[in-house]
Amino acid sequence: MDYRFGRQYRLLKTDDFSSVFAFRNRRSRDLLQVSRSNGNGLDHPRIGLVVGKKTAKRANERNYMKRVIRDWFRLNKNRLPPQDFVVRVRRKFDRATAKQARAELAQLMFGNPATGCRKQA
């Protein structure tokens, strides 16, 4: 198993983010929202992260949230389909609620309709 998180697993360019947002395939929970593409033409998934200053004013808080999401992706990327994902943090979470954020991320990424995720058009 490969647990690295190299550049090939990241969405880096504005066009990559725009193409994912153009599909308008979004699901959200209390803390997170995940947008996904139909496919990326590669043999592995890629992820992009959006954590705005409205969510958390301090950079160390935003970095912590991104680190939690990246770590979850790094450990689970082999189980995900070859799609592009953009994860947007809707509400701030910290060490106390990081477990809830990981659980929500799993529900949103694996796309189980029985999880009660809200689908947005």
From Swiss-Prot:
Keywords noted in UniProt: Endonuclease, Hydrolase, Nuclease, RNA-binding, tRNA processing
Catalytic activity: Endonucleolytic cleavage of RNA, removing 5'-extranucleotides from tRNA precursor
Annotated Gene3D superfamilies: 3.30.230.10
Main EC class the enzyme belongs to: hydrolase
GO CC list: ribonuclease P complex
EC number(s) reported in the record: 3.1.26.5
Cytoplasm is among the record's keywords: no
UniProt-listed GO biological process terms: tRNA 5'-leader removal
GO MF annotation terms: 3'-tRNA processing endoribonuclease activity; ribonuclease P activity; tRNA binding
Subunit structure, interactors included: Consists of a catalytic RNA component (M1 or rnpB) and a protein subunit.
Similarity section: Belongs to the RnpA family.
Task performed by this protein: RNaseP catalyzes the removal of the 5'-leader sequence from pre-tRNA to produce the mature 5'-terminus. It can also cleave other RNA substrates such as 4.5S RNA. The protein component plays an auxiliary but essential role in vivo by binding to the 5'-leader sequence and broadening the substrate specificity of the ribozyme.
Record protein name field: Ribonuclease P protein component
Organism: Neisseria meningitidis serogroup A / serotype 4A (strain DSM 15465 / Z2491)
Lineage of the species this protein comes from: Bacteria, Pseudomonadati, Pseudomonadota, Betaproteobacteria, Neisseriales
Underlying gene: rnpA
